[in-house]
Regions:
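Short, well-ordered beta-strand elements within core beta-sheets of diverse protein domains
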Residues: 33-36, 179-187
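Hydrophobic side chains in beta-strands
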Residues: 70, 126-128, 185
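Short, flexible turn/loop "capping" segments at secondary-structure junctions
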Residues: 24-27, 117, 173-178
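Generic long, charged, amphipathic alpha-helical segments
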Residues: 138-184
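A broadly conserved detector of short glycine/acidic/proline-rich loop/turn motifs that flank catalytic sites
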Residues: 13, 81-82, 129-131, 165, ...
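Active-site "cap" helix and flanking loop/linker of ATP-utilizing ligase/carboxylase catalytic domains
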Residues: 45-64, 81-155
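Short beta-strand/turn micro-motifs at beta-sheet edges
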Residues: 20-22, 112-114, 166-173
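Internal nucleotide-binding/catalytic subdomain
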Residues: 1-87
């Protein structure tokens, strides 16, 4: 939201919250997401567009997201997020072709512009290790601390590091979260 209007196209994304495939395991903040970019549509007009006058009135500028459940009975908003989140921003970076500095500057400056994006879907997956999604420094130390992060090929396109350190030219897990990186791609 540039302070006056939502910048187009809008981002529509589908989050996967459970730790394991098949919607099983403990809930996490987000394990991965698929997304695409769209022009104004019924989902936008039923949710974000209705908030435009209030956001403008209060002088809000920035990212704004509404989580919803959509089914045969309608669109049901669950929560709003007024900040960039992880790994969503990393996946959006995969799809935005406008340079990020230019995008953020134009947004913060209140400019009327359109985000240049790739066609198709963007996907991101959180690469996790113990103790994620829990906080347990002892488990991290035992199972994950300094673990080597290996790529079959030396291609780091789509790799967004989080808790990683570089030791003698090798990526190793750092921190205590078990959240070393996010991998993104387009198709």
């Amino acid at each position: 939201f540039n302070g006056i209007d939502f910048v187009m196209p809008i981002n529509i994304n589908f989050e996967h919250k459970k730790l394991f495939p098949g919607n099983i395991g403990p809930s996490t903040g987000e394990m991965g997401t698929s997304m695409f970019w769209a022009k104004s549509n019924p989902l936008y007009r039923s949710t974000l567009e209705k908030l435009k006058p209030k956001l403008k009135e209060c002088g809000y500028v920035g990212y704004f997201d509404i989580n919803t459940i959509v089914n045969a009975k309608g669109i049901h908003p669950l929560e709003a997020t007024s900040r960039f989140g992880y790994p969503t921003i990393n996946i959006q970076m995969e799809g935005i072709t406008t340079p990020m500095g230019e995008f953020l500057y134009n947004l913060a400056s209140g400019k009327d512009f359109e985000i240049k994006t790739k066609r198709g879907f963007q996907v991101g997956v959180v690469i996790a290790a113990p103790p994620f999604p829990f906080k347990d420094p002892a488990s991290f130390k035992r199972y994950s601390e300094d673990a080597l992060i290996i790529f079959k090929k030396p291609n780091y396109d789509g790799a967004h590091i989080a808790d990683v350190k570089l030791v003698d030219g090798e990526w190793r897990m750092a921190g205590t979260s078990g959240y070393p990186l996010i991998m993104t791609g387009s198709g």
